[in-house]
Amino acid sequence: MATNVGGAVDNSRRSISDNRHDPEKPAELPDTLSGSETERPQDANPEAALDQQASDAAKAHDEGPPDGGTAAWMVVLGAWCCSFCSPGWINSMGSFQEYYQREPLKDYSSSEIAWIPSLEIFFLFGLGPIVGIIFDRYGPRPLIIGGTIFHVFGLMMASLAKTYYQFLLSQGVCSAIGVACLYSPALACISTWFLKRRGAAMGIMATGSSVGGVIFPIMITRMIERNGYPWALRTAAFLILGLQVIACLTVRPRQKPVPKKLPAGRLAAPFTEPAFALLLAGIFILTYGMYIPIDYLPLSGLQEAHMSVNMSQYLVAIMNAASLFGRLGAGYGADIIGRWNMFIIACGVTGISNLAVWIPATKSSITIGYAIMFGFASGAFVSLVGALPVSVSPIPELGYRMGIVFLVISIPALTMAPIGGAILQHASNGWVSLKVFAGVMCLVGSAIILGSRMLYTEKRLIKAF
């Protein structure tokens, strides 16, 4: 992505200070923190110097994100398709877990089979820094094209799989790598087209994963019953391919990326900034509280609320449907009260609902009510978690810093299932202990992110940020 070229050290520091606390304007960092433009060895590479001068001239006439227009909303459309096909697909993995245990992998334990969806979630977020660096240098198109190929090819191979390692490699690795290349670039592109309406645009994009989380499980379950597992996967792969063609044609950054290597010092910079480090710590803790209900609510409904098997399976679809409205509402609310404020409030409400509603949910009606409340409140986590680093990151490092946040999310996403299982198995009152753990993680994570927000706003609590 295009960058601003700094002057002397004092000017660079002043630019960073001016932009750091503005919630409506990402900070801009110079390419170097020492030396002036005249000290660059431009003569060594005349073509690179001309490219840099052209980039500087384009930026000098840049009037900022348009916050609308045909091109901007077409980017949102393509990003919605990416969201539908990446986290929306991941949200359907429960359908495969049940089928694998019943048919092709019935000789394997549930914990062994669980590695397939766990790896998908891990790759979705864990490849974030690598995907981010590629995005910053070359833009979204190579990633989206490559991700589409990996995702579709992995699903086609999974439709032919017969053994455990074939399912693991095709769906848990190949398809998952493709998924990782789709979501982050689309999310980062939206931030270059929108500023004042960025929350709403990201909220609209995030509804794609909710719609996918509702459509894919129902489609896969019904097609396995009627047409068999292989054609269920192939049909899903063809649907994903069609939507990703739209994404390839519409998702593009507002400014042409300038390939350049990020200095090693800048790679480590996010971890040395107290406010950003607090943000990472808060998101790490918060993720545990967000993912435990998603994974364990159907089992809780079956064992505690004595729901039927069919009804307990529909709890995930109910959560995703409620999450759709939560993501839209959080996006529009973020443009009014600030992205950080909206995120912290919604995640705090999620923690309270885990403690106040999920713990006493021993009846079907209460469990369904909790699924709706949790889905609506947790929608802000999905729609706004990428907006937090965007609002405080230098534009040249946008993809990389967003990737770091996703990498932090990947660790709890990978370890959450065994931790939750251990709590259920070894705690004296397993379900209550698990629900308390989820609620406390949400509240503690929200409090830490509030601390990060206070550092960014110089301890001003009443401020749209």
Curated annotation (Swiss-Prot):
PANTHER family attached to this UniProt entry: MAJOR FACILITATOR SUPERFAMILY (MFS) PROFILE DOMAIN-CONTAINING PROTEIN-RELATED, MONOCARBOXYLATE TRANSPORTER
Show the segment(s) annotated as Disordered: 1-66
* Matching Gene3D superfamilies: MFS general substrate transporter like domains
Write out the biased-composition intervals (Basic and acidic residues). Answer: 11-28
Primary localisation category: membrane
Entry's family note: Belongs to the major facilitator superfamily. Monocarboxylate porter (TC 2.A.1.13) family.
Q: Which residues are glycosylated?
A: N310
Identify one Pfam family in the record.
MFS_1
Its recorded name reads Fujikurins efflux protein FFUJ_12242
Q: Which ranges does the record mark as transmembrane? A: 70-90, 115-135, 142-162, 175-195, 200-220, 231-251, 274-294, 314-334, 342-362, 368-388, 404-424, 430-450
- Cell compartments where the protein resides: Cell membrane
UniProt cross-references to SUPFAM superfamilies, sorted A to Z: MFS general substrate transporter
